């Protein structure tokens, strides 16, 4: 069972969520780039690990640097070290329909975010219904949803693999290239199902940054909001 949150939640936002579920492993990148700015994540990861005693190891994935300095994080290991040596053969074991899959959280507008456990079978059936019947996603599609891994739409996007669709992922600001970055991706990546949060598209439209004439609708089907 796993859970995720976005780097923009900050240290306390992550602790408010992860502190309730007693995680044993914390995975983090050493940092990220947003709108041209390099943002370090190691100090935040160190604070999170110190605040949650259940965490046994912090696994760091290099992104800003090929060799991140891990000295300030106790229990830290590099992702590459987890892959070294003789690894056992990957085994897929049958699970029960109601076994837990991941934990999402409420918005936190009325206090600390509440944990919401999602089961394997129910989640897959619900997502498959929405992908197949509501969105008509198939193995011929290239599926994109602009979302962080802290929003439930990330989980919804990943389930598109069950429909055989190819997933297109984007890491960065939606307002790069004067607001055209995501729209340009439709042509560049041949995206057939494009979706984004209402606020990100509306902000660009209101600023008159996106012209409908810029979009090749022969490639992409109507967007999902």
Question: Which ranges hold each PLM region?
Answer:
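Short hydrophobic/charged patches on amphipathic alpha-helices used for structural packing
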Residues: 15, 92, 180-183, 212
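Conserved AMP-binding/adenylation subdomain of ANL enzymes
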Residues: 1, 124-142, 152-192, 207-209
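Conserved pre-ATP/AMP-binding loop-to-beta segment of ANL
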Residues: 59-60, 66, 71-105, 112, ...
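Hydrophobic, small-residue-rich alpha-helical packing segments that form membrane-like cores
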Residues: 12-13, 18, 24-27, 95-99, ...
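Structural core segment of the AMP-binding/adenylate-forming
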Residues: 1-81, 198-200, 218-222
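Generic beta-strand/beta-sheet core signal
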Residues: 5, 29, 61, 103, ...
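Gly/Ser/Thr-rich phosphate-binding loop
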Residues: 77, 165, 192-193, 206-225
């Amino acid at each position: 069972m796993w859970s995720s949150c976005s780097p923009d939640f900050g240290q306390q936002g992550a602790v408010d969520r992860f502190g309730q579920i007693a995680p044993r492993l914390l995975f983090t990148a050493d940092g990220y780039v947003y709108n041209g700015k390099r943002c370090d994540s190691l100090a935040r990861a160190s604070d999170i690990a110190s605040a949650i005693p259940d965490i046994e190891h912090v696994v760091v994935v290099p992104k800003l640097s090929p060799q991140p300095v891990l000295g300030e994080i106790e229990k830290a290991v590099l992702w590459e070290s987890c892959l070294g040596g003789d690894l056992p053969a990957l085994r897929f074991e049958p699970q029960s329909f109601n076994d837990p899959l991941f934990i999402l959280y409420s918005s936190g507008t009325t206090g600390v975010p509440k944990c919401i456990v999602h089961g394997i079978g129910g989640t897959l059936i619900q997502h498959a219904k929405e992908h197949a019947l509501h969105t008509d996603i198939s193995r011929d599609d290239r599926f994109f949803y602009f979302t962080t891994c802290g929003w439930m739409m990330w989980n919804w996007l990943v389930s598109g693999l069950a429909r055989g669709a190819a997933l297109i992922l984007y890491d960065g600001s939606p307002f790069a290239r004067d607001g055209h970055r995501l729209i340009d991706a439709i042509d560049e990546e041949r995206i057939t199902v494009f979706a984004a949060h209402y606020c990100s598209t509306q902000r660009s439209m209101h600023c008159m940054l996106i012209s409908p004439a810029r979009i090749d609708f022969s490639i992409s089907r109507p967007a999902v909001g």
